[in-house]
């Protein structure tokens, strides 16, 4: 069955027929390619570094309020500004430009242009969905039956996001006599969803983060340890506890929900003749939803 706004829609077309047992099995594999972000025309590392250099040179400040330029520029954000602050060169750069920077600062800034992190490639993936269905049906003149089992495993384009569903259907009809026919149907399914704790505009949401993360930021060092992004949070780079790494966050958060539903339907049919029939149906449904959210202290 499928849940509707005011109840449950039950598909009753699949029923057993008189005759020898009929066995069916089918499987389906669905491929969902990785997201295509080429049309977004995002900046690469060289373009982003050049933009930061331009904005940093053109921004104006005052002592009390900081920025006076109407352009929304935050000189403390961005790796270019961090490098200049490290060498105490922001004022010199504003007066003398690129040639006023020390060779060490120039080399550090130029190195940023060589790092091009493909966030679409490391945050998303190609995904596959597997579906299996098995059924057996048959019966005699008095009793017919239809039983089926189904299983679906769907992986999301984001690693760690998945859905699995198991469903069972059992239908039996009894022809008591020429007038009376009774039946019983049972529909059961269990659905499990795995994802992460986030919201639409949360940094842990890869769709959102991949659009604001700098292309020159590498989330791991050469040993595979986490590196932290200080440009997407309101914090200072001197405060290591406030740095952000989406992979560390996702490794320490989890959200799992399990939904179980069982629906039983009993029906009675009285047949007086070909023109006159009376049909009655009653159903009972049981639902259970459990949800678990986890967020580590890190």
PLM segments and residue spans:
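A beta-strand signature from Gram-negative outer-membrane beta-barrel systems
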Residues: 1-24, 124, 129-131, 144, ...
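Short glycine/proline-enriched turns and hinge-like loops at secondary-structure junctions
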Residues: 2-4, 160-163
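Membrane-embedded beta-strand positions in outer-membrane beta-barrel channels/transporters
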Residues: 8-10, 131-133, 167-170, 187, ...
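Outer-membrane beta-barrel strand-turn architecture
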Residues: 15, 139-142, 174-178, 270-276
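Surface-exposed loop/interface segments of Gram-negative outer-membrane beta-barrel transport/assembly proteins
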Residues: 17-115, 126, 156-161, 167-261, ...
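Outer-membrane beta-barrel initiation region
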Residues: 122-126, 136-140
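Short, charged beta->alpha transition segments
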Residues: 132-135, 236-238
């Amino acid at each position: 069955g499928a849940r509707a706004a005011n109840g449950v829609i039950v598909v009753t077309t699949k029923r057993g027929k008189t005759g020898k047992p009929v066995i069916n099995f089918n499987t389906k594999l669905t491929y969902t390619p990785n997201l295509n972000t080429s049309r977004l025309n995002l900046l690469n590392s060289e373009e982003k570094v050049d933009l930061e250099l331009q904005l940093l040179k053109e921004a104006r400040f005052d002592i009390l309020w900081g920025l006076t330029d109407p352009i929304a520029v935050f000189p403390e954000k961005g790796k270019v500004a961090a490098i200049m602050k490290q060498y105490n060169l922001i004022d010199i750069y504003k007066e003398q430009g690129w040639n006023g920077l020390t060779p060490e600062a120039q080399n550090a800034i130029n190195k940023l242009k060589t790092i091009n992190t493909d966030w679409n490639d490391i945050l998303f993936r190609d995904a596959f969905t597997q579906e299996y269905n098995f059924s057996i049906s048959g019966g005699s003149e008095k009793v017919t039956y239809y039983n089926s089992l189904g299983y679906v495993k769907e992986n999301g384009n984001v690693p760690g996001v998945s859905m699995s569903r198991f469903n069972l259907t059992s239908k039996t009809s009894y022809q008591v006599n020429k007038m009376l026919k009774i039946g019983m149907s049972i529909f059961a399914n269990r659905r499990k969803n795995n994802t992460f704790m986030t919201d639409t505009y949360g940094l842990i949401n890869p769709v959102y983060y991949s659009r604001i993360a700098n292309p020159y930021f590498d989330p791991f060092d050469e040993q595979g340890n986490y590196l932290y992004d200080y440009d997407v949070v309101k914090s200072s780079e001197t405060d290591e506890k406030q740095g952000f790494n989406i992979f560390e966050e996702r490794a320490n958060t989890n959200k799992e929900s399990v939904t179980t539903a069982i629906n039983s339907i009993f029906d009675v049919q009285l047949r007086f003749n070909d023109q006159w029939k009376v049909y009655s149906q009653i159903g009972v449904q049981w639902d259970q939803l459990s949800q678990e959210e986890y967020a580590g202290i890190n």
